[in-house]
Every structure is written in C-alpha cells, then in structure tokens.
Amino acid sequence: MEQDKLEYKPDYASAVSTAMRRPLTDLFSHIRSLAAHEELLTPYLRQELEGVLLSGYRLLRVADSISAAEKYEPAENAMTVFPLWPHLREGLEAARLLLGVSGSTLQYDLPETQETVRADEEMLMRAVLHLISNALDAAEDGTLVTVRGSIVGEQAVITVSDTGCGIAPDRLDSVFEPYTSLNRDGLPYQSLGLGLPLARRVLETHGGSLRIVSTGEGTAAVCSLPLCNELPALLRSPAPPYLQDTFSPLYTVLCEYITPPWPYSQP
C-alpha cells in the first residue's frame, strides 16, 4: 500500500516542485535584498524577516520532499562506492553543531573503520537526516537523539534513537504511511509525512531495510545497508559542503530545529 501511494506520476510531482521553487527563488532573493540593508531593520522587522525566512525553508523542505519522492529509485550515475562512516560522520558533525546552537542535543558513535558501501551519497544522508528530524519531532524538549553505527555480518547498521515517550503500539503500523504526519500527542504535524516512507524506500532500493522499534520509553529507527567489497574511486568528488551550502538537506530537513542562516552572512 505504501509503495502504491509513493508511485504517483513523476511529471505531476516535477511540475508541482518546479512551480513551488520559482516563487521560492524570488522569496529568498527579496529576503537577501532586505537583509543586505540590516542597518535599516528595527529589532521587530528583523524578527519578522527571520519568521519569513523560516517559512521559506519550510516550503523548500516540502518542495525537496516532493522531488525526493521521484528519486526513490536512485539513478545509476548517482551510485558511488565510498567509505560509509567518514561520510556519515561529516554530515552528523555538521548537524550536531547546528542543532546544539538551537538547544537540541545530537550525539553519534560511529566505527573508526573504513567499510565501503555502494550508494547515492546525498539520498543516504537525506534519509538519515529525516530520521533525526522525526526523532526530534517526537521528542520532549531536551531529549537526546543518538546515532550509532555498527557492523553485523555483511551489513552496516545505523540506529537513530531518542529517549522520548515512544510510539503507541496502535500507531506503529502506520508510521510508514505517506502523507500521515502526527506529533507526539497524535495530532497532525505541519509536514507532508514523507520522511519515514522515503527513508525506508532509500534503504530498500539500496538493498537494505528500515524498521521502527518503540517500547514506550523512546524510539529507535534501525537501518541496515549491505557492505560493498569494491574499493572507492581514487578520484572522488569532494564531500558535500554541508555547512557552507545553506540550501542543502542539512538546512532544509532540519529547518524546524535550527536557526535558518541569515542570508546576508552567506559568502
């Protein structure tokens, strides 16, 4: 059922995403123009402009989610062989820094080894960020979110867990339902509800899996990904500039829990 709901017409999804991005480009351009004259902004106007900026990032997250829904079958040219743990460590450290500034706590414990996987780097990182975002959505203020990595047989296992109130047993079966997004009180949340189903699809199309475990005292999203025996390319593209690219998945997926970057401070 979940798979059928995700398989909507790509042309329609592309048109919706493109239609959203055009006015968003204008919106961010106008925000940048106003921010460039910061000396003219009163504290009140600065606060209001920050609110508009956050709304822009929320809409960009929606557009990105719709685009990502099209890409749940990774393109062959996007698949590369790379060391998994260094790749995750770089993205998680960037997320930890941004979340820490905003008062949320993320910690991670990853192996220091160099096991490789064959995957779409951007989509894999996006999937992990969605799991972190979902953990923060369901967590109480000050709840710790932890990402752990391990090797089990021929699989890399990534576990994203929180110490919140957990998920009610009668809701566990519906957490992967697309377009169903509920907060910890069971009330509708302001998102499309595509994070978990897309994260699972990303893992499954890479030969892995995603399952949710909740005992009433916290929740864990357990990802598995097959290891690859190939060596990474000697000449690989540079690692994504997670912090420098202020429109990367790091900023859009986690926009509810970080302070959006003030546009005038961008290089």
Identify what each model region corresponds to.
Residues 51-59:
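Short alpha-helical segment of the dimerization/phosphotransfer core of two-component systems
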Residues 72-78, 116-119:
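Conserved micro-motifs of the catalytic ATP-binding
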Residues 100, 105-115:
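Conserved catalytic submotifs in the C-terminal HATPase_c
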Residues 162:
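Acidic ATP/Mg2+-coordinating residue in the GHKL
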Residues 167-179:
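Short conserved segment of the HATPase_c
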Residues 207-208:
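Conserved glycine-rich
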Residues 217-219, 224-267:
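Flexible, glycine-/charge-rich segments associated with ATP-binding catalytic modules
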